């Protein structure tokens, strides 16, 4: 089995030719994730990565989507990279099968928080189906530690139809898991939009929890909506201003240092 290393400055599209590199050199701070793009030039169903000692490695798949040609001629009809999906989730949802004779993937390596500054040689072993390949990565660790709080602020929505559970407790558990996943990848949530009923006390508790979390660069409250027929659209989603007024009043009356 072979693994071809791609330059991180190159965006590989299905069908493009590519240089086949073997040397891998990365740089990052303690606690940071560094990454490289690679290709397994044969069909495979699943792939995982392991690293030496305290170094952690993780693989993401680059999933493709087929686009039609645009009327402007900017895009041709072909398959383009769409999103990256981590290997464990891809396997769970049967979303990691390569049908193109090659597989584009990203390998992430986490630099330990206590790693010594300087140059390290880390052995990475990638397993795909029944085959294995090992590569050595030269990783230069900078002499500082990445802060817990990050500046990568993102906005994402969580809908009831995304979390398949009618039980409120299970819904909240899965909701919290999604929030933690964003924080794990240094994406600080700014808008959480769960459908369903959030009590005022529950919203206050959640806000206190997130504003006290040093990993969160920003956070905003969930809000409540309802469906209403308007002159613009049937079943349009509208902001529940009465709920919002009660929520903001509760915050004003229960302010904290955070």
Predicted segments with their positions:
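Hydrophobic residues positioned within well-ordered beta-strands of beta-sheet architectures
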Residues: 36, 47, 105-107, 122, ...
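Aromatic-lined carbohydrate-binding surfaces of glycoside hydrolases
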Residues: 84, 96, 110, 121-123, ...
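Surface-exposed binding patches on compact interaction domains or structured appendages
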Residues: 2-20, 33, 43-108, 115
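Non-cytosolic beta-sheet module surface loops
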Residues: 40-42, 128
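Short, solvent-exposed loop/linker segments at the N-terminal edge
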Residues: 26-32
């Amino acid at each position: 089995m072979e693994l071809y290393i791609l330059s991180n400055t190159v965006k590989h599209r299905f069908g493009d030719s590519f240089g086949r590199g073997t040397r891998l050199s990365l740089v990052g701070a303690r606690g940071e994730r560094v990454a490289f793009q690679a290709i397994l030039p044969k069909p495979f169903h699943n792939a995982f990565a392991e690293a030496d000692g305290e170094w952690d490695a993780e693989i993401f798949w680059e999933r493709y989507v087929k686009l039609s040609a645009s009327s402007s001629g900017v895009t041709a009809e072909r398959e383009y990279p769409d999103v990256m999906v981590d290997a464990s989730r891809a396997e769970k949802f049967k979303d990691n099968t390569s049908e193109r004779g090659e597989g584009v993937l990203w390998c992430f390596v986490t630099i330990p928080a206590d790693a010594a500054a300087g140059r390290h040689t880390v052995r990475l072993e990638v397993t795909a189906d029944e085959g294995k390949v090992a590569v050595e990565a030269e990783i230069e660790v900078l002499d500082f530690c990445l802060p817990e709080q990050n500046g990568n602020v993102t906005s994402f929505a969580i809908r009831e139809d995304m979390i398949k559970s009618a039980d409120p407790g299970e819904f909240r558990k899965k909701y919290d898991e999604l929030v933690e996943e964003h924080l794990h990848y240094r994406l600080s949530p700014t808008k959480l939009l769960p459908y369903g009923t959030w009590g005022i006390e529950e919203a206050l508790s959640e806000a206190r929890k997130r504003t006290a979390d040093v990993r969160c660069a920003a956070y905003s409250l969930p809000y409540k909506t309802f469906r209403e027929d308007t002159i613009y659209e049937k079943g349009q989603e509208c902001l529940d201003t009465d709920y919002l007024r009660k929520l903001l009043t509760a915050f004003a009356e229960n302010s904290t240092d955070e």
